[in-house]
Amino acid sequence: MAEITAKLVKELREKTGAGMMDCKKALGESGGDMEKATEWLRQKGITSAEKKSGRITAEGLIHSYIHTGGRIGVLVELNCETDFVARGDTFKDLVNNIAMQIAACPNVEYVRVEDIPEAVAQKEKEIEKGRDDLAGKPENIKDKIVEGRIGKRLKELSLMDQPYIKDQSITVAELIKQTIAQIGENIQVRRFVRFVLGEGIEKEEKNFAEEVAAQTGQKVEQPQAAQETAKVEPPTPETVEEVEPPVTPPAQETDSPAAETTTEPPKTTPVDKPKGSPSKKGKKKK
């Protein structure tokens, strides 16, 4: 494989008008062959796109996209050079696909890395420096690791650097370059905003019965068992010691202690004989 020199990259850039990084990548993919690199750039739609990137884009569309369920919404402005292109199906499909891309990427906040404020980049850098896995490493090694991580992190915030949701082999930037080559006009994503339902609002926890009661002005009564359960507190060591055992009521007293275990036969009461009735023993013979 031929060495990719700065001179070779410059030569390809002057020939095609493509960006430096695109030229370097094309030479790497083609093994340093200039003709193959040029063909690779043409296939990616990069050659003509770079030449048109400086043109003014004052036309275009502001497109809205509402995701299924109505919980995520996107507004995006995509610019082109002429109104004729803006009204074409190719441009409309592109702006809709970009809006869907934004809806699918919750971390994306900026169009490109160059749009990220320096304060945000510096804050991300401080976060990376404070990670535990960098503790004890030499400063020069730590700086290299941080630079690599911060570059990756900033790309996560950039729309242009996201893998295209319908074709993960290309980025959103490459998708736009391919469309530029197809329609022959410069295209730029100017700005976008992403809405999420309820974002930033602290939600109050309510059950369905309480919500209905709040709307109708009625009071929700809990079941008696639930109220008693809610009042019962778990015993503590102090309360356990103070609890007295339950008092058992005294047993009913009986005449004889053995009455509980021994059953005596019932006593018979003698019947008095009526007066005037002589007994057999006292009867005299005449």
Swiss-Prot record:
Residues 215-227 have a biased composition (Polar residues). It holds the Pfam family EF_TS. One of its GO terms (molecular function) is translation elongation factor activity. Residues 82-85 are annotated as: Involved in Mg(2+) ion dislocation from EF-Tu. Residues 212-286 are annotated as: Disordered. Associates with the EF-Tu.GDP complex and induces the exchange of GDP to GTP. It remains bound to the aminoacyl-tRNA.EF-Tu.GTP complex up to the GTP hydrolysis stage on the ribosome. This is Elongation factor Ts. The lineage of its organism: Bacteria, Bacillati, Cyanobacteriota, Cyanophyceae, Oscillatoriophycideae. The gene is tsf.
